Amino acid sequence: MLTKEQKQEIIKKYQLHESDTGSPEVQIALLTERINRLNEHLQIHKKDFHSRRGLLKMVGQRRKLLNYLKEYDINRYRELIEKLGLRK
């Protein structure tokens, strides 16, 4: 679970302008952080299938947002996956 401060830090790092909180970049960065934390949880709790299902939903949502960004602006897409260290 992300704290309010951690969430604000991620938003500040990826926002496009001062009041930006919902751009695809910000949403993808927040999802990536949640996915990484859930991955760590699942390394320890291997039989937590409910959380695994949530993880798969989040990965699917992130993939949809990445596909949207790729169609909308390929340069922003490439820059974001470079920053986040994602494949593809």
From Swiss-Prot:
One of its GO terms (cellular component) is cytosolic small ribosomal subunit. InterPro entries: Ribosomal_uS15, Ribosomal_uS15_bac-type, uS15_NS1_RNA-bd_sf. GO terms for molecular function: rRNA binding; structural constituent of ribosome. SMART domains: Ribosomal_S15 (SM01387). It comes from the Bacteria. One of its GO terms (biological process) is translation. Keywords: Ribonucleoprotein, Ribosomal protein, RNA-binding, rRNA-binding. Belongs to the universal ribosomal protein uS15 family. PANTHER family: RIBOSOMAL PROTEIN S15, BACTERIAL AND ORGANELLAR, SMALL RIBOSOMAL SUBUNIT PROTEIN US15M. NCBIfam families: S15_bact. One of the primary rRNA binding proteins, it binds directly to 16S rRNA where it helps nucleate assembly of the platform of the 30S subunit by binding and bridging several RNA helices of the 16S rRNA. Forms an intersubunit bridge (bridge B4) with the 23S rRNA of the 50S subunit in the ribosome. Part of the 30S ribosomal subunit. Forms a bridge to the 50S subunit in the 70S ribosome, contacting the 23S rRNA. This is Small ribosomal subunit protein uS15.
